[in-house]
Every structure is written in structure tokens, then in C-alpha cells.
Amino acid sequence: MGSEMCIRDRYAKKRGLVLVTGPTGSGKSTTLASLIDKINDERNAHVITLEDPIEYLHSHRKAMINQREIGLDTHSYADALRAALREDPDVILVGEMRDLETISTAITAAETGHLVFSTLHTIGAAATIDRIIDVFPPHQQQQIRIQLAVVLEAVISQQLIPTADRCGRVAAFEVMHGTIPIKNLIREAKTYQISSVLQTARKEGMISMDDALLDLYNNCLLYTSPSPRDGATS
């Protein structure tokens, strides 16, 4: 899909935090594998993936990729992430940010110059930011907002929707970049305004889920017309 190519091209970055979110079965692992594949094609990078389970095997091309499976090669995401940081990777893929320790370590890894990819089961960019902040106790939340505003490069939220011919599903992507206005909203605890920014920033490559669904419908790719509650901004 064109959207997937746009995501691949934009997020082969050098550092920062890129989150891919959505419900179970929405294709998050496929999107992450595509991003790692892009890096493998273009960068002489050391990549460590931490997965539960490993779904896609990556061969070495330009990048050196070490894949580790939670439960087989390591006890937990938090333990695996701490161990990975001692190996001086350029890129770390964390299959899922499940708990405070993993989230905190992933943010720290992004702060210290690594490119970190991970997933959450949230729907929508604003809900993703809120979920991360809410994991932390109240006295830490403002500091986490500041850290997250610095390191966040993107939130890609996706859904799989039945196609017009009812023979398959098509991916719809909400895309939020870590622009200065977005970073300011995160820092100021105004995530409720993110949906408004997404609706007016398409020239910057951002799009709300409602608009993404409408685009698919207008291109005759959806079986039914999208309702506002189909999107992540409702």
C-alpha cells in the first residue's frame, strides 16, 4: 500500500521513539517488520529485536540483526531491553511496551541516541500518549511528558477493515509525527487537542483515522462507509 511505503520511507530514522499501535490482529508486527526491512536495505546498523514470539525472520543485508524471543532467549521485555543496551545497538525493536519498567527503559534508550520501535494496544495517537503517561505514578507524570515530548518521532495507529469486495481486509493508518506543535501538546498535557492537529496537518504527512477511513471509502476500498466511531478521534 502507498501508506505503508510512506511510513517505511519516513521512519528509517537515526534516533527517537516510533510507536505502532492498534488492536490485536491489526497488523502491527507486519508494519514493524517493514520498518526493520527498510533499515536493513539502507543502513549499516546494529539492530536488536525483542519479540514474543518472533514472527518474521530477518536476514543480514546492510544491517546486522539479532532477534531474541521472550521466554526462550530472555525472561522479560524489561530484562531483554536492559541487556540489549549493553550491546551498543543502533536500533531496538521492543515487541510490546507492557509495563512501567519497559516503557521507562524504552524512553531512556531513545533519549540516549537509539532508534526504538515498539507497540501498544491503544487505538489512536492521543490515547497512546495518555496510556503511556497513565502507567506512571502522578508525581512522575510531568517528567515523563517532558521526556516523551523530546523523543517521540511518531505514533502510527492502524486498523484492518473489510474491503469493498468482502474478500479481504485493508489497513487504515492514523499517523502523527512528533512535530513542534505535537510536542508542545504532550508537554502541556493537552493531548485532547491532538485530533484537531491531525485533521489540519495533512501537508505535514499526518492524518486522523477518520480521514484515513474516508480516503479508503472514496477510493472504493471499503465495504461500507465509515462512521465517526470507526476512527480513533471520536
Where in the sequence are the language-model features?
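Short, flexible helix-loop junctions that flank or precede catalytic/ligand sites
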Residues: 1-4, 8-225, 229
